[in-house]
Amino acid sequence: MRNTVSTFQELKNKGEKITMLTAYDYSMAKLIDSSGINGILVGDSLGMVCLGYENTLSVTMEDMLHHTKAVVRGTSNALVVGDMPFMSYQTSIYDAVYNAGRFIKEAGAHAVKLEGGATVAEEIKAIVKAQIPVMGHIGLTPQSVNMFGGFKVQGKNEKVAKKLIEDAKILEEAGAFSIVLECIPEKLSKIISESISIPTIGIGAGKYCDGQILVYQDMLSMFSDFKPKFVKSFGNIGESIKDGVSQYIKEVKEAKFPEEKHAFKIDDDVINKLY
């Protein structure tokens, strides 16, 4: 049975942790979905881990719709959330609703995510009014990397911490069904999670959130450009891939692959007539 926004709320209400990962293509989405994950975020992080950009700012709506369609086709259980890219909702409330609608209508997503606190409350209200579930995102919001001066922990002083608590409450009031808390101190995420009734999903926000999300390339050691402090490696798939490719190259060079069992047959009578 497909997870829904109601599933997320039910899990929080009974104290069971929510599990999420990113995915960007059909084959990986299918693997993750079959593992029993509650939700998959088609994150604009694809700009960095799939497209090689320095940050997420260059990702377009067309990029996001293309990848979201593939992920949806690979799932039957997970709630699929489409990440609204930079400048797809900041320009106007009309654009926010229109682009959120494209994720649902064209890509088949079940919800959208957008970054920001009080500044995006009206956009969230309008999107929810259009019957589209919204996941909020506060703390380190990568689309604001130039304002933050880099990828830095947020909420370490009283002023910013209080604002994050207030932002979470505002997002709940605006109609968000859950909120991602990224790169904020663990004890602050505990206060936020206890201050609102909707689920919090942490990434670099400690153990007190109602759920967790990671970029799958990070948690499987597939992305070597950098490794955030908050990431734990749950498998060294990157090395396994390199080992497999190296072995393939070796066997091709040495004419050990393909073997007879990998080849298709033809009758000798037919072959003899070809000479």
Curated annotation (Swiss-Prot):
GO terms for molecular function: 3-methyl-2-oxobutanoate hydroxymethyltransferase activity; magnesium ion binding. It comes from the Bacteria. It is found in: Cytoplasm. Gene3D superfamilies: Phosphoenolpyruvate-binding domains. It is an enzyme of class 2 (transferase). 3-methyl-2-oxobutanoate binds at D44, S45, D83, K113. NCBIfam families: panB, PRK00311.1. Belongs to the PanB family. PANTHER family: 3-METHYL-2-OXOBUTANOATE HYDROXYMETHYLTRANSFERASE (PTHR20881:SF0). This is 3-methyl-2-oxobutanoate hydroxymethyltransferase. It comes from Clostridium botulinum (strain Langeland / NCTC 10281 / Type F).
